[in-house]
Amino acid sequence: MKEKIVLAYSGGLDTSVAVQWLIDKGYDVVACCLDVGEGKDLDIVYKKALDMGAVECHIIDATKEFSDEYVSYAIKGNLMYENAYPLVSALSRPLIAKKLVEIAEKTNSVGIAHGCTGKGNDQVRFEVAIKALNPSLKAFAPVREWAWSREEEIDYAIKHNIPVSINHDSPYSIDQNLWGRANECGILEDPYAAPPEDAFDLTNALEETPDTADEIILTFDKGIPVQIDGKTYELDDLILTLNALAGKHGIGRIDHVENRLVGIKSREIYEAPAAEVILKAHKALETITLTKDVAHFKPIIEKQFAEQLYNGLWFSPLTDSLKLFIDSTQQYVSGDVRIKLFKGNAIVNGRKSPYTLYDEKLATYTKEDAFNQDAAVGFIDIYGLPTQVNAMLHGGYSNEQ
């Protein structure tokens, strides 16, 4: 009886070729495809996996779990790797790994295979997650093992009659989910080459965007967006709605050269319309609901959290602790944020909260001012005392300094 291998199957080039490759190695292939909001026709994927020779194919709708358990932390934590990348692909990997392990245990498979290359981040993310969840499972990386170029892989697919929606003229590698879309390879590998319009799918070019702005009110409850203009949504539906609306205005295009975990720099094209709008709105709401010390310290945690996720360490004690901290900061991050969507920009022009720490009577310069300006003299004396003592001992700073 042949041993079984669970394959993370997308229906794309790498995993379609991997099915045949694993069969040639003597394994029965159990294909597993997760829907995390990419809008893929899963019936086609299911049929294709079986046509490729898989003995089973499991289709799992994990969109809601993805939004509620993973994207929610990206929002509450304002997660951006290198202040540019909203972790589109990285965010889905721990969930995919979790489901693959569940299928492997259910089918008595000896290991899990993925379609990642040997120079990408995802191989690390999947394999480290698998080790954390079930150390007894083996990891298989066909693409890494055969070490073909993109062109060689396409030629192999054509030779073996493997249908793939890719050719030498359009050799993009695309990954998409609820939170956005990632694109690499082809002309995009030249960091000076302007991305052609066919590299984008979720967003309009600025020249094609409406000449009239849309203004929306995004309502948050404990850090999570729950309404658009007073209409309540589940988080996954809200994100899909915003993707369409913000994408229409060309919002969410990201052209980024990032530092990969494996040590190389990689040029990536991302589209994340909803992510850009939600994160800007969330940050705006935090400016009036977080205390100064929390507002200043939280970005340090956010940076570490983003790096943990990018580096494949979702299932780790540190990440568990970071999640607890992030959750603790969101108790009062509730309220409304008004955002103008226009010509590639998401512009926050208003925010309010029942828990606002902004006191207009303290901030105003009108006669309604409630701030005790007389208290400033004593405050400055105490605050400036260390500076004064240092100057008295060592001499004051000269104009030249």
From Swiss-Prot:
Q: CDD domains of this UniProt entry? A: ASS (cd01999)
Binding positions for L-citrulline per the UniProt entry: Y85, N121, R125, S173, E258, Y270
Task: Supply the alphabetized keyword list.
Answer: Amino-acid biosynthesis, Arginine biosynthesis, ATP-binding, Cytoplasm, Ligase, Nucleotide-binding
**Protein's pathway:** Amino-acid biosynthesis; L-arginine biosynthesis; L-arginine from L-ornithine and carbamoyl phosphate: step 2/3
In alphabetical order, the GO MF annotations are: argininosuccinate synthase activity; ATP binding
- Source organism, top-level taxon: Bacteria
Q: Tell me the leader sequence span.
A: none
E.C. numbers = 6.3.4.5
- List ligand-binding residues for ATP: A8, Y9, S10, G11, G12, L13, D14, T15, S16, G115
Which PROSITE patterns is this protein grouped with? ARGININOSUCCIN_SYN_1, ARGININOSUCCIN_SYN_2
Q: Name one GO biological process term.
A: argininosuccinate metabolic process
- Can you list the GO cellular component terms from the UniProt entry? cytoplasm
Q: Which Pfam families match?
A: Arginosuc_syn_C, Arginosuc_synth
Q: State if RNA-binding is listed as a keyword.
A: no
Catalysed reaction equations from the record = L-citrulline + L-aspartate + ATP = 2-(N(omega)-L-arginino)succinate + AMP + diphosphate + H(+)
Q: Which PANTHER family match?
A: ARGININOSUCCINATE SYNTHASE
State how it assembles.
Answer: Homotetramer.
Instruction: Give the matching HAMAP family.
Output: Arg_succ_synth_type1
This protein is called what?
Answer: Argininosuccinate synthase
